[in-house]
Amino acid sequence: YTDRKSGFAVQIRLRILIFGLCGRNGEFMHKTEQEGLKYQKLYNWAHTLITSGVIKNMDKFPSETSLQKKFGYSRQTVRTALRQLEEEGLITRVRGSGTYVSYDSSGVNGERPQIGLLLSYYSDYLFPRVYDGIEASLTEKGYGIEVAVTKNRLNDEAIYLEGLLKGNVSGLIIEGSRSAFPNPNIRLYKEIKRRNIPTLFIHNHYENMPFDSVEMSDSRSAYELTRILIENGHRRIGGIFKYDDRQGIERYKGFVQCLSDYGVKFDDDCIRWYSTKDMEEKLSKKGLLRMYRRTKDCTAMMVYNDEVADYYMEFLEERGLHVPEDISLVSFDD
């Protein structure tokens, strides 16, 4: 995000962004450009969910109204994305009943050896990129994918792991669920280890489990983002963090470590927390208002990810507050 005090815009790779809704040349995007990007994000999200088999053939597809509510997009944006999906034969509208998936992914992998891909959630901006990258690499090596989404529920993780083990998968790629907490599915992970099934965690890992992982350095990244804010004059810095995933805890660690190292006062009231279970409530307009009332004196905020940042920026805009003129935001992912 563009900084409020200096007006600078910095982008740190490793999926971290300091961002001011700017175009390629640093100019603010027109509303039509923003709507076009939103339509493409929604289309990519839906296309990946359908072709990966997360939403299966003949399953009911979310309605226009539910998609508007989920993403905060206009009806026209949602309709444009759905129209393209329908034109490609991925969904079918049934008058008086709703919209249904009309794509069968069951025969795509054929007899190829399978890799189980277990993700904790699917979001509009990140899930398609993660899935597409993994699929491309595995397909090149002759593997198919069995994908499942736990919605960050440990019970669902157990069900899917049991199913994948019964299916004799050749390997596992796992994004941990509620990874900040002790995991109750130790028995299943011990069985994975006993069978010597190659297993790799992405984005996070579980404590005391002997598996390799590929992760962003969340703590270090948060430290660097906080340092940038401090070096540009901010002394009243708040944050919105997620407490049930390791990424949120690590980002909080980096944040408070940087404040301490630079002698900037930490204020409990300026830190707001949420989890998967209460995310909808905390990121509703009422929930964001409660957060804002506790943090309104902050000149800068660190936000858990760009999904939350979008909600918060929209809330601020509705109150006549603008990024970067009135407040600076730093965030992760995108």
What are these regions (language model features)?
Residues 1-7, 13, 17-28, 41, ...:
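Bacterial carbohydrate/catabolite-sensing allosteric modules
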Residues 118, 173-175, 300-302:
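Structural motif
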Residues 121-124, 151, 177-181, 242-246, ...:
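Short histidine/acidic/glycine/proline-rich micro-motifs that form metal-
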Residues 105-112, 175-188, 277-280:
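Short, flexible, glycine-rich and Lys/Arg-enriched loop motifs at helix boundaries
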Residues 106-171, 256, 261:
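Amphipathic helical "hinge" segments at domain boundaries
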Residues 4-109:
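N-terminal helix-turn-helix DNA-binding module of bacterial transcription factors
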Residues 64-65, 154, 219:
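The beta1-alpha1 cofactor-binding region of Rossmann-like NAD(H)/NADP(H)-dependent oxidoreductases
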Residues 64, 131-132, 252-253:
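Short amphipathic alpha-helical segment that frequently serves as the phosphate-/nucleotide-binding helix
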